[in-house]
Regions:
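S-adenosyl-L-methionine
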Residues: 1-64, 101-154
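Conserved class I S-adenosyl-L-methionine
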Residues: 61-75
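Conserved acidic residues
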Residues: 64, 152-153, 177
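Conserved SAM-binding loop of SAM-dependent methyltransferases across substrates and taxa
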Residues: 73-87
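Conserved SAM-binding motif I beta-strand of class I
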Residues: 88-95
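Conserved Rossmann-like nucleotide-cofactor binding loop
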Residues: 98
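C-terminal substrate-binding/active-site "lid" region of AdoMet-derived donor-dependent transferases
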Residues: 164-231
């Protein structure tokens, strides 16, 4: 573990500078869960997520209960909680079980706040986007938790380029839900199985009854596209 006096402890130094507990949470994710945050905190990832948060703040709409799909380490959740956005709670779903403890650690303050944030290991194809029931393993009680039911108002997916059966997934979202989507045109990455050429193609693949925002962000190697609206 890096000592607080060590100048290599960037998270510790930022905590002292800003008094923002998020930096301590990031530090704990690295120290206690061996989290590699180099990609999650890359300029491309952070600029894309900051763009999303900024546009939501400009729209000034209530997000209510948020389902963050393919949420990874839920750095976006941390940014949303620190924003001006009106949020009741966030549930972050990812099929990779290694994400759970890291995401919960990064958002530890909201986890402790009656689970205002909670990460769940689950395939986003298996979620009921109308009224979803979920459980997690409780180490404290050595058993599964009692079932919890959440009804999402907002569905966010910033990893649409990774969703192989995107049409099938999108069809699961009920009409009227607020949807925030990001994809890109970075076709060179093998894991990017659902890239789009531009915003026009993206809008065709994800039709909405009311579009609140359509835009693109120029990044060094690719363009990222974003749609915000009601399905």
């Amino acid at each position: 573990m890096i000592e607080w006096k060590d100048d290599n402890d960037i998270y510790g130094r930022m905590l002292v500078l800003t008094n923002n507990p998020l930096f301590n949470n990031l530090r704990n994710a690295v120290d206690n869960h061996d989290a590699d945050l180099s990609d999650a905190l890359s300029w491309g990832q952070l600029k894309s997520k900051r763009w999303l948060v900024t546009e939501l703040e400009s729209l000034d709409i209530s997000l209510g209960t948020v389902f963050l799909c393919a949420g990874w380490y839920a750095t976006l959740a941390a940014m949303l909680f620190q924003s001006k956005c009106n949020i009741d709670k966030i549930r972050s779903f990812d099929i990779d079980e290694s994400c759970l403890q890291i995401a919960d650690t990064i958002n530890r303050n909201q986890v402790k706040e009656d689970w205002k944030f909670k990460s769940i290991t689950q395939d986003i194809m298996d979620i009921d986007y109308n009224k979803h029931k979920w459980q997690i393993w409780s180490n404290t009680n050595n058993r599964m938790s009692y079932p919890i039911t959440d009804m999402p108002d907002t569905i966010i997916n910033t990893s649409c380029e990774h969703i192989e059966n995107f049409d099938e997934w999108y069809a699961k979202i009920p009409s009227g839900k607020l949807v925030i989507l990001q994809s890109n045109n970075f076709f060179d990455v093998d894991e990017h199985v659902n890239c789009v050429e531009d915003c026009t193609q993206f809008r065709i693949t994800a039709p909405m009854t009311t579009q609140l925002y359509v835009g693109e962000l120029e990044l060094p190697k690719y363009k990222r596209f974003m749609l915000i609206g009601y399905k």
